[in-house]
Amino acid sequence: MPLQQNQIPHLRFNHSNNDPVLRRIRFSRTLAAALMVLGGWFGAPAANALIPYVYLPTEEELKGSSIGIGRTAAQLLQLGQAKDAARLAALAVRLNPNDERFWSILAEAQLRNNDLKDASRSLARAKELNPEKAGLWFAEAAIALRAERPNDAVPLIARGLQLDPKNAAAYFDLGNARIMQNELPLALESFEKATALKPAFWEALNNQALVLYELGQHQEAVRRWRRVLKLEANAEPMLALAAALHQRGEQTEAIQLASTALAKNPNYVLPLHQAEQLWGRRIREATAQLLGEPELTNIVERAQANATWKKSQ
């Protein structure tokens, strides 16, 4: 039976021949003799029997292992465990450095860890291996946008769209890049292409309204924000619509929408968060006027206390 916890086994013997030290010496001599006999029997020195055998996996076996590791890394990314995913993806590319999928997973993990330089290097390697994969161009553009380099992002997205012209998300990113370049008509065009490909793409429809508002087309912006809220009751279009309605004197609905929006996402009370979401100057100013209404004082103070947003690095 197994030893119980905290018990120390005792050696028992009745006479000197059973001394454990003597037994060990005799056992060692017996073992040495046996090895000598085996060595002579098999025609090799006994010492060879003590050399460990190291198994070296084949290239195919390493590739097979990398697939399982890469798949696990991708699953960890889906679960939001970017650091663990990066470690596994790095192992996968060491085992199989010629598969662009593992480099892509590694780049995504590095991007989520805000390691933009390493993510760019990993994507560059992936593109060397498979330059005709549109997703790699889009991913590199996403890194450029994160680094606030829209001039670099635009040609990368354009190249990706040559390979995958029906990618709604790519047109959305292109629209965001155009906003950052202050090319508002081009931004609107890109967002409209995104919703043409994917009509329920409410984020692109919301950004259409943001651009229209900055272009002075307030009525059309309001109409599109109402369409957005039929698709998704999100705090961003809700507060933007409230600000636009407040400018038109529709006080009751504006106050109600603003109250609901800030309860859903208090971060939108912060002008810097609005700016990071690519809100233009006009809609931010309209929102500031709305949030200055006495009826919203308590709601605004609560949102400011509950806001958790921090500027992306």
Each predicted region: which residue ranges?
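Canonical tetratricopeptide repeat
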Residues: 71, 105, 139, 173, ...
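Structural signature of tandem alpha-helical TPR/SEL1-like repeats
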Residues: 79-87, 112-125, 147-159, 180-193, ...
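Helix-start (N-cap) detector for alpha-helical repeat units in TPR-like alpha-solenoids
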Residues: 65-66, 100-101, 134-135, 168-169, ...
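TPR/TPR-like (Sel1-like) alpha-helical repeat modules
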Residues: 226-235, 239-270, 295
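Terminal, low-structured helical/coil segments at or just beyond the last alpha-helical repeat
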Residues: 51-57, 260-313
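Position-specific recognition of the canonical hydrophobic site in helix A of tetratricopeptide repeat
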Residues: 77, 104, 111, 138, ...
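Alpha-helical segment of the N-proximal tetratricopeptide repeat
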Residues: 62-101, 105-112, 142, 146
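Short coil turns that delineate tetratricopeptide repeat
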Residues: 63, 97, 131, 165, ...
